[in-house]
Amino acid sequence: MLLTFGLLARHMGHEQFALNATITALTNLGVQICGLGSQESLVRRVAQDESFYPEMLGHVHILNIATGAVLILIGLVAIPVFFPISEDPMVTFAATGLILVTNIILLKIIWLATNSYIAHSNFGGANKLEMLFAALRMIAAILACTVFGITTVAEWAVWNFAAHAIAAMAAMVAISRLGRPKFTIVREEIPLGLMFASQFFFKALRGNADILVLTAVASSEVLGSYTIARRLMEASYMAVEALNRILYPGSAAAAVQGLGRVFERAKRMLFVATGIGLASALFVWLITPLLPVVFGAEYASLSWINRSLCWAVIPIAISATAFEALGASSLQKVRAKITNISSFVGAGVVALAAWLVGIDGVIASFYALEIIIAVLAWRALSRVHAETTKPQTDQAAFAGSIHAARAE
């Protein structure tokens, strides 16, 4: 992934690379809405009862197609107006269409395959699909940049679409091996899916507000450097994310036996996730001197931005353990309340900091928000656990409140 990113940054130059980052930030918002959180529902429900897979697969397909079509139409209207890719309107329209289909529809198909295998606890199959996807994108970037010498967003859109299309076809074959879908809407999962999707939409909004505002107030070099540093920090989180994905089905199954079991798993995972986050941050900090060689000397701000931002993975890893436990316990309302409010407010804080202070304000607000979210997430999980361990006379009342929270 980093090789792909490095090739694009070097060969596009900071102006086209910054434009690509801005459009990608917008599609990141769309992909969180696409499907209305149905893939999380699939993982959770199938982990608890594999016989329910056909219904959940059909549920996901219906919601992905319906919401994806709407999002693509919106993007085709908005992106060419605010972020034209080329002086030629036809090139802009065609490239925008390819980007939207790639970053929303095809990406959702690939994610569906990996999530389906995770739901069946087939982590080897999920990892193979992700490795294939990463390899295809890397091959596309190598060919596009070093052989064909692409330099624009429009040119990369074609190559990126091709890589995603091949990966999506492989994903569909992989999905077919698990069983055929039964096309139906699982109505009770719609509210939970919306809660889940809203969390990641607002999180993506907060995570991309900085890029969108920096587009207006910072140079393309600073925006490009910040985008690279953000991607490095996010890549360093992948080990923690992989651990979460492996443990999530087990946590969902444990939730059937009570929230106490999930809380104990989360406490054990907290130490592991924090350790992995610390090691990942240290690694990114140590490789900083190599970044100008990899991405190009024109990204003059990259080194100091990277070393300032890389440690943010630690509070992110800490909060993720609590959020995964809440999600596995079907307490999406509790999780969504924390995520949505903090992300909505955080998006405004980050945008204001970017507008008033620039890149320094973005980095400072990023740390402050992630630390606050980690504290709130663990406080909520601890409160839920404390209530479940109350004396027997109090548990009946609390059980009703938990049931209501899950149902809403």
Residue ranges: model-predicted function:
Residues 1-39, 194-221, 347-351, 366, ...:
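Signature of the first transmembrane helix
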Residues 5, 34-51, 119, 229, ...:
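Helix-loop junctions and terminal segments of transmembrane helices
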Residues 15, 81-99, 286-314:
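Interfacial segments at transmembrane-helix termini and the short loops linking adjacent helices
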Residues 22, 94-98, 127-177, 344-345, ...:
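Hydrophobic alpha-helical transmembrane segments
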Residues 23, 28, 32-80, 91, ...:
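Membrane-water interface segments that mark the loop-to-transmembrane alpha-helix transition
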Residues 45, 104-130, 311-341:
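Membrane-interface junctions at transmembrane-helix termini in multi-pass inner-membrane proteins
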Residues 61, 65, 97-101, 124-131, ...:
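Hydrophobic faces of transmembrane alpha-helices in multi-pass small-molecule transporters and flippases
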Residues 124, 149-160, 166-207, 246, ...:
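Interhelical loop/hinge segments that connect adjacent transmembrane helices in multipass membrane
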